[in-house]
Design a protein with these regions (language model features):
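Hydrophobic beta-strand residues in large extracellular and virion-surface proteins
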Residues: 27, 31, 42-44, 53, ...
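Alpha-helical interaction segments
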Residues: 11, 19-21, 40-42, 54-55
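A short, exposed loop/beta-hairpin motif centered on an aromatic-Gly-Thr core
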Residues: 13-26, 34, 67-68
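Short aromatic-glycine-(Arg/Gly/Cys) micro-motifs in beta-strand/loop hairpins
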Residues: 1-16, 47-54, 60, 66-69
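A short, charged, amphipathic alpha-helix used as a generic interaction element across diverse proteins
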Residues: 22-41, 75
Length: 75
């Protein structure tokens, strides 16, 4: 099962129509899991009132949030 199929049961906030992690700690745990999945470094970044995951896939900068209890690329 990929990390993108795993349920995200952590607290979230909505900022500018994007669902983000409420806490940095939860975002950091998911950043570690995502980094293993995509085999590339992933960091957490404060966006408004929440935390998103940031990394690169195939040389393209990506940001991940949450949609329906799943990780989703938002940029």
């Amino acid at each position: 099962m990929t990390i993108f199929a795993a349920s995200v049961f952590d607290a979230t906030v909505i900022f500018e129509d994007k669902e983000l992690f409420k806490g940095r700690g939860a975002a950091s745990v998911w950043a570690e899991k995502l980094a293993k999945e995509i085999e590339s470094p992933v960091t957490v970044e404060k966006i408004g009132t929440g935390w998103a995951l940031r990394g690169q896939v195939d040389g393209v900068d990506c940001t991940w949030g949450i949609l329906g209890q799943r990780l989703k690329r938002i940029t």
